[in-house]
Amino acid sequence: MFSVAMDEQIHLPAGFVHLQTKEIEFRKSNAPFVGVLAALPGFLFEKPELDSKDADIVSNNFWDFGNRFLFTHNADQLVFSGRMVVAILSVLMAVYVFKWAKELFGEKAGLFALFVFIFIPTVVGHSQLISTDVGLAAFFLISSYYFWKSLKHNRLKYKILAGIFMGMALGAKFSGVLLAPLFLLFTLIAVWFSSDTLRDVRYWSEVRKKLLKFFGLVLPVFAVGFLVLWTIYFFPADLSFYSDGLRSVYAEDINPNYPVYLNGDFQKGGWWYYFLEGFIIKTPIPFLIFLLWALALLKKHRVTFLDKMFLLVSPAVLFLLTSFSAHNLGVRYLIPAYPFLAIYAGSIISHINKKATIVFLVSLSVWYVFSAVNSHPDQLAYFNEFVGGSANGYKYMDDSNIDWGQDLKRLKKFTDANPDAKVVYVWRQGDRALDYYGIGKEKNIIDLKENWWANPRGTYAVSSHFLVRAKIMSQAYNEPSLDWLSLYKPKDRIGQSFFIYEF
């Protein structure tokens, strides 16, 4: 359905390099596991040629290498097989949403939590791409589930499973490290505060018992997690392999002066409330109501304090970490929080016992399905009714919230029907992608020296990302004619990522 999206051209080729070289040196600023998994089908069956001594690999020039590698091979086939891997991870995540909600609140709640989860547009949209955020979300949730089980039953098999998926979460994205402090916190709650005998520690022997129990619960999980992570990194001799990657996260390809866009304004460094607002306007309103409803019933749920902590503290910490450390480039960073919230939202079904509440729930559910389905196939660009729907999304956010350069296939259909149309395409997929999809790089006028934007003539298909960024360029260069969003009304759109203008 979609052409190669922005980050796919680095995640997938990097995965091929890792599988070929059996080491994680190329693009070590990103955890490798999702890229490796996505590349595995192509590596085994397509077998594209790859020279591990390629100059771009040696110099860690992952953007240029990824672009050249994909578009000189069968990019569509390689990306399709990689996307199928991520889709499977998304389905697996949905299974555990149902499983956990069922064990906590009953089978009906499990089914309702599953229903809530599978219609979240941001999750669905990124599950169609090679997304490290979806991979992290799946492993984060499953590891948390098994760690919760291990605290409930203290069985070795649950500790091992929690550790396995913890290692995978760490290997999927560096923000997987959040599992460590969360698991320590939950273990502390389980050991010290879960029974009356743990509230009044009078003797050092009792303290010692609790410490032994504490470490007995967490150390096996952490040990297995490290072994899995070490395996993902192909058993490096230097055990600082992961911390080296963590340190390099902000060292590569990050421009601190890049102006972040929100609500029509630009600001270097972004806003602390970027992700909170993004969550509110890019999540269907019925989902938000389900969640508030569940929170209003917080004291009525027949589950333990520890159960509630797993479902509420985990997404809260993810929100906080994302808000104060992640670049303001997309609500996709919040995807790992959604399954926990869907599970908790599912709990409301166990409190539905009046006709009025049944009618209200059904009405919300119909609205929810309509809102989500109506955005197909552009779930990635979904915005809710608070801002007037997806058509107005560009007024509030850009980048991976709307346009990631993923609509070249639909652009090809448009240019076939309108052969004289000019294209303005700014993503790093660039000329090779335009040629690969049969559009032709010569149609892209972005680099023409003449001021084509000042006196436009004919038909233009313009990337919405460019249109948003042109607003700040028009201010910086005192060039009002660049600001097409203010000057002209588009005749049509291709999804939400290309605006069609006729002059």
Where are the regions a protein language model picked out?
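C-terminal luminal/periplasmic domains and tails of membrane-associated envelope-modifying transferases
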Residues: 387-503
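Interfacial juxtamembrane loops and adjacent helix segments
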Residues: 24-85, 239-268
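Signature aromatic-anchored transmembrane alpha helix within multi-pass, membrane-resident enzymes
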Residues: 181, 218-222, 299, 304, ...
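Transmembrane-helix motifs of polytopic, lipid-linked glycan transferases
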Residues: 84-104, 139-146, 299-300
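Membrane-interface helix-loop-helix junctions at transmembrane boundaries of multi-pass membrane enzymes
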Residues: 103, 196-216, 293-313, 355-358
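Hydrophobic, aromatic-rich transmembrane alpha-helices
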Residues: 97, 278, 283-305, 362
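Membrane-interface transmembrane helices that cradle and orient dolichyl/undecaprenyl
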Residues: 143-158
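Short helix- or helix-capping micro-motifs
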Residues: 113-118, 145, 166, 170
